Amino acid sequence: MVKYILLSVLWFTGFFQQQNNAKEIVRISDERMRGKSMKGEMILKVVRPEYTRELDLYSWAKGTEFSLVEVLAPAKDKGTTYLKRKKEVWDWVPTLERTIKLPPSMMSQSWMGTDFTNDDLVKEISIVDDYDQTMLGEDKTGDRMCYKIQLIPKANTAVVWSKVVMWIDKKDYLQLKTESYDDDGKVANILTCSDIKMMGGKLLPTTMEIVPTDKPGHKTIIIYKSREFDIPISDDFFSTQNMKNPKQ
């Protein structure tokens, strides 16, 4: 009897440590990928069966609550800006000379014609604190061995996905692949990160590609041209007044 009790205690201890390790891996990865603040230039490609649209963007972000994105090119979209301040989103459209606050009815619509929604921008969900993490094992993505970790949203957490599975590089804790599952348990979209380089003092994937599984020929690609991390930036920078001509 004592033997079985000891075995049970050892199994539970090992299971508890494994789950703690999964959460710690996700925490380290999240900190390395995000930083406290960030700014940088990127190319956004929207790929559809009929066309490919490309935008040159500059973005600023602070934590999960503040972000500002300015369109640099093409010329017809230049000067358009998008502001996220906590749970609210605004557009500045130069041709209309108007700042437009997005109503709740528009939050589920596509952001800039991409495979992201406006709602994706305003969510402040933490993959560390708002999910329960479980280690599924190890798996290879490309030429890198990764931790394969399942994330299940905690009760009362307002998220779209029923679960998320992440592949986090064992060596550098980079998030290289993420599968998001719908309520039916099917993969809704797949996010892959590649082209790992030094940028802004961090070793990071510089290309991100999201593919919705139910829309053949659709994908959105983000290619980072430059990134700076942990820069001093005031909350006041993220204001509607600053949208017309962002300066930092």
Please provide the spans of the model-predicted regions.
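N-terminal mature ectodomain segment of secretory-pathway/periplasmic proteins
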Residues: 20-95
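Gly/Pro-enriched, hydrophobic low-complexity segments
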Residues: 122-124, 142-240
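Solvent-exposed coil/turn segments that connect beta secondary-structure elements
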Residues: 45, 62-64, 72-74, 87-88, ...
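Short hydrophobic/aromatic-rich beta-strand segments that constitute the beta-sheet cores
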Residues: 40, 67-71, 89-93, 99-101, ...
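Sec-dependent signal peptide recognition
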Residues: 1-8
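Acidic/charged, solvent-exposed loop-and-adjacent secondary-structure segments enriched in E/D, K/R, S/T
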Residues: 94-123
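Hydrophobic h-region of N-terminal signal peptides that target proteins for export
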Residues: 8-18
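Short, surface-exposed beta-strand/loop "edge" segments at domain boundaries and coil↔beta transitions
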Residues: 50-51, 75-82, 98, 156-160, ...
